């Protein structure tokens, strides 16, 4: 979900869950409105300060919400993942996932596999049936074969998962990073760019996601 107009257009489409992008984790009025219509809500927490995540968690209390750790660098390198951050997010909720923007054709599925082994309850990946070079997000998208591989990995026990990880990425601990890490300059620049990228035209007004707007 990227805009107010998209929110209202989606209400009657029959979806029982909705996903909020990292750049709207701090769009508090937007999230309040989403909570009115959906109980199951996935929220990425990339490029978001701790006090903003806390406020969003307070808004979502009482719903079936999932927080996704995310690094908003496209593509994300394996040493930029800070996957130990997932454990830090568990102070808010046990439903913690990972939004993965690594390049599968360079680093495989190791980032998602590592997150699953570390206890992620859900994984978000861009998905395509096209060649990786045909779309803007193709380089960070997985194809049906890779999706099947990831699904199979999720069905293995923890011991087998660890064996696979250590075989594919012996230096996996480099991806754990710092649970209290600071947002990087690149993430903050992306926050400024993407937060202002989408707006809605509603009731003859241009409305950004972080602004107060709600249909009566």
Name the predicted role of every residue range:
Residues 1-216:
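Catalytic cores and adjacent flexible loops of soluble metabolic enzymes
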């Amino acid at each position: 979900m990227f805009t107010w107009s998209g929110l209202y257009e989606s209400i009657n489409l029959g979806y029982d869950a909705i996903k909020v992008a990292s750049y709207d984790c701090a769009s508090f009025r937007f999230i309040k409105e989403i909570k009115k219509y959906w109980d199951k809500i996935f929220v990425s927490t990339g490029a978001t300060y701790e006090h903003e995540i806390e406020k969003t968690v307070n808004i979502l209390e009482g719903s079936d919400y999932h927080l996704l750790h995310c690094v908003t660098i496209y593509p994300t390198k394996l040493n930029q993942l800070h996957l130990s951050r997932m454990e830090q997010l568990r102070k808010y909720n046990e439903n913690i996932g990972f939004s993965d923007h690594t390049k599968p054709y360079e680093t495989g599925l190791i980032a998602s596999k590592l997150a699953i082994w570390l206890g992620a309850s859900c994984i978000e990946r861009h998905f395509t049936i096209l060649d990786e070079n045909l779309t803007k997000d193709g380089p960070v998208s997985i194809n049906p074969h890779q999706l099947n591989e990831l699904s199979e990995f999720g069905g293995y026990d923890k011991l087998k998962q660890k064996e696979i990880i250590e075989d594919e990425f012996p230096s996996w601990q480099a991806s754990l990073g710092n649970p209290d890490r600071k947002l990087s300059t690149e993430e903050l620049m992306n926050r400024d760019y993407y937060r202002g990228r989408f707006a809605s035209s509603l009731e003859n007004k241009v409305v950004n996601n972080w602004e107060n707007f709600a249909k009566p």
